Amino acid sequence: MIFSSAVAAFFSTNAAPFILGIIGGLLTNFIWQKWRDAVEKNAAARFSQKVSERLVHLSADFKDEILLLDSAGTHYLAENISVQVDEDLKFLVPCQADDVRAIAEAARGKAKPTAIAFEKDFVVPRGLTVEAIGSSMGIDHFRERLIAGSRATAERFVESYEKPGRFGEFNGKSFFLRGFTRARDPRGGDERTTFFLALGMTDWFTGLTLYNVYHQLAAEGHGIVHADESSISEKYNWFIRGFGVNVLAILHDGGKRYVVFSKRSGNLYNMRGKSRWHVTTNEGLTGQDLESDGRLDLYACAERGLREENGIELRPMDAIRFYSFFFLRTDFELGILGSAELRLSQAEFSKQARALARDNTMEIRQYAFVEFTERAIQEFYRRETEAGEEFTASARLGIEIVSARNGLNRLNT
């Protein structure tokens, strides 16, 4: 009786309609939010499924050049990418004494001594030998192959200082693969993918030497050329001597979006003597990206690449997103593909690249700004290839993957 009287008294007041209106509004908003979340979740699931189907076809089409190791349906979360380095685990190839002298003579007055410092003997993890490492990969005469490969690398160093138009090679910290694992959150959502990469320490000279040995083995028809995901991580991991962060910049300019391709110098080792169209920035992980806890930050590496190669400092509204991990067969390297959304005009980008980029004159010959539409990208690709220009596999796969995440149809690059 008392409760009924209280209810009746409430409804007789002037405040009742107002309070009921607030409650009704909150309830309506709650129901609307739940419905919208469900619609967006279903749309994201359909989009993720569409992207996954597209990636299956891309993986098959690029299988001779690139092996896709993992892809997020939307994009990776920063906390779900882990790169750990064991600084005590080292694999280093020496530079022969006479080659060291030849490099020093060619680089006299052009390079600091620390830039051309090399190991005097092989350095391998405790309990292993060079021969044992070679045997585990089914490679005979591995020590002799490495020494021969090191001499070819030394010749490259000498030429880089002697030939006009070349920039001097230098040695520095780099990393080799110990292994990688991946996992997907059972709660669902590809954005919850976790990718863990374990690395050991090496140097740039060793990396180039392994690059030479790999191509020799490939010419001999060694099984390394058919490496799959398992053997890359567990058998031939010693040859993974680099990790590249590949980013395509997308400019927001005058209400339109433009993707930026860079034409890389043919003097770069992975261009093999011919300038090619590539992603906007391709930065390798180095000692600069190593944090005090032994971890590497891929986002920091991408930001450094944009700054050093393109003169771009990220602004608060800019965003870097990573989509796919891959293995580049032609160079036996691991990499990650992503995009950088930049609030910059084409003119601003060009101005900053000319004025602020540290590596621009050495590595990049020119830029191409292409409207981010299927028709414009396809026309640019057709025009350039008909003119005899080439695109790297990373650039072709990269634009396909970035386009897929932005709702564009297959480009067939």
Please provide the spans of the model-predicted regions.
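N-terminal leader/linker segments that precede catalytic domains of diphosphate-processing enzymes
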Residues: 25-304, 312-413
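Short, strongly hydrophobic alpha-helical membrane anchors
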Residues: 1-11
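Juxtacatalytic substrate-recognition/specificity segment
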Residues: 307
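Hydrophobic alpha-helical transmembrane segments
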Residues: 9-25
